[in-house]
Amino acid sequence: KNIGNPFLTLYECVNPTEKHSNISMLSANLKLNNHFDFMIRSAFQMENDIREQHRPVSTVGFAKGYFKTQNIFNYELNSDVLLTYHNSFSNGLTLNAAAGGNMMVYKVNMLSNAANGLITPGVYKLANAISSIEWDQKILNKRVNSIYFTANLAYKNKLFLDITGRNDWSSTLPKKNNSFFYPSVSVST
């Protein structure tokens, strides 16, 4: 069994990482009248990771050294709209209801380049590769559009009926079967 030099592994087999991120949100709430409210919001999260992998010459598994770079860019955008209704009636009924929609967009782009063997030991640059650069790119795109509703009907705060429903359309499912609905109904006292 080949055991590596612990000093070399600890101090020279490094994985430097640089990360940049941004999270932003914007929202607005409007009271339309005594019974209706409207809310709109959007949130955006973006990250960019720049990663490296350094393996010096004579490292176990990397006799000629190794250098890898990865640039991972991803973002997610989430936007919602929601209309709510609330009313108490003179006959003891109270109704709270809401209907809305959501759009979620997610994207990842990962690009990797690797030098499997270094011309000059300790120089971690792709231009220092012994042979051609190995590269790989992965792209992931996902989008989910949703509509949803909820209603709560109460009678004298003793009998309750709750109904909810949500339908999602996902870009990662086959177009003919990309929709799924999940309802719920409950009665309680």
Annotated model-derived regions:
Residues 37-39, 94-98, 160-162, 184, ...:
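Residue-level detector of the transmembrane beta-barrel scaffold of outer-membrane proteins
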Residues 106, 188-189:
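Short, basic alpha-helical nucleic acid-contact segments in DNA-binding proteins
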Residues 90-92:
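A cross-taxa feature marking solvent-exposed loop/turn segments within ectodomains of secreted
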Residues 127, 176, 182-184:
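Outer-membrane beta-barrel domain signature, especially the mid-to-C-terminal portions
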Residues 100-107:
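Glycine-rich, aromatic-flanked loop segments that form ligand/cofactor-binding clefts
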